[in-house]
Amino acid sequence: MDMRKSNKMVALGLALTLAVSALTGCGANKQTSSSTSKSGSTSKSGSSSTASSGSQATSGDKVVVGIGQFAEHGSLDNCREGFIKGLAEGGYKEGENLEIIYENAGADSGIAAQIANNFIAKKVNLICAITTPMAQISYSAAKDTDIPVVYTAITNPVAAELAKEDGSSVGNITGTSDKLPIKKQLEMIRKIMPDAKKIGILYCTSEVNSEMSVKEYKEAAPEYGFEIIEQAVTSSADVPLATDSILTKVDCLNNITDNTVVNSLDIVLDKAKKAGKPVYGSEIEQVKKGCVASMGLDYVYVGEETGKMAAKVLKGEAKASDMKFLTFEEADLYGNEEAAKSYGLTLPEGYKEVGK
């Protein structure tokens, strides 16, 4: 073949290859631009958090709220119910302008992390975290995003490192505290059991709020003539043996809002009944299950106030980072007459009957 013709053919082939490559590259750039444009769409809800992130989940004109609940038991379910009610009072109603994605971790921190990361991946407008572990995990997942976290059912946000000593936020997170009315609880137990000396408390070592509650109980107990006997567990599997052990050392048990122990409350109540040792609860649902009495909060109300806070954040009326967490001063006396009678105890006047 003539060398000059050969060189011309090679040059022509190279030119065609470059032309095709250029066209392919242009097509790819157009696809990338189109994809970026879609992912950058914003909600029409007017949410400040959505506007700032520019890429959060929407469903038509609805805002999307992810509710992560660490465990499933009465008080936490009541918080969730109240939260949705509070959102409605703030103008966000399911089926109208609100979509809720609810996930329960089953008291598993690994699953809780998956839930939080899933909310981030879906780019929800706001995360509601129920309990301390869920709030800590959710805040950690959302910290580098514009997604606000609003928590509830947290005993001590400061100890959980979600708030500062003055109640202000450490970041794009706020919520409500269900701090126990410890002195009122001890006063109630003293009225019901005037001769009691030792109160037992079971708690899980992985829940920082529980450790703080036990510490506060131990500090306040002497004022009411009590000594607190504590028994730690590391998981729900430890609860049966731990309950057997502590019941031999105390006059009664006082159950706090420890998720691990509350999840095993039926076991605790059964063993306590056989031992003839009454159990006092920390909120209404525990009393319904068989605890004698409690100076506790109405968790539907706690959740409702949390929902109202979340609605303000979604509307852009406030930023989670600028809102101090809320606490509740008032506590009601709930009593289970049937449980009290089974131990030969008399409930104080003015209690609210919440038996089964």
Predicted regions and their residues:
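Extracytoplasmic "Venus flytrap"
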Residues: S59, V63-G90, I101-G110, S206-E207, ...
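Beta-alpha junction/loop-to-helix N-cap segments that form part of ligand/metal-binding clefts
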Residues: N104-K164, D258-K277
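Bacterial lipoprotein signal-peptidase II cleavage site
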Residues: L23-S55
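An alpha-beta-alpha
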Residues: V65, F83, T174-A221, M323-A339
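Hinge/cleft segment of the Venus flytrap/periplasmic-binding protein
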Residues: K312-K356
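Hydrophobic alpha-helical segments within soluble ligand-binding/sensing domains
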Residues: T58-S59, N156-K198, L297-A318
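Flexible loop/hinge segments that line or gate small-molecule binding clefts
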Residues: I137, A142-I182, G281-A293
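Structural motif
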Residues: E99-A121, A232-I246
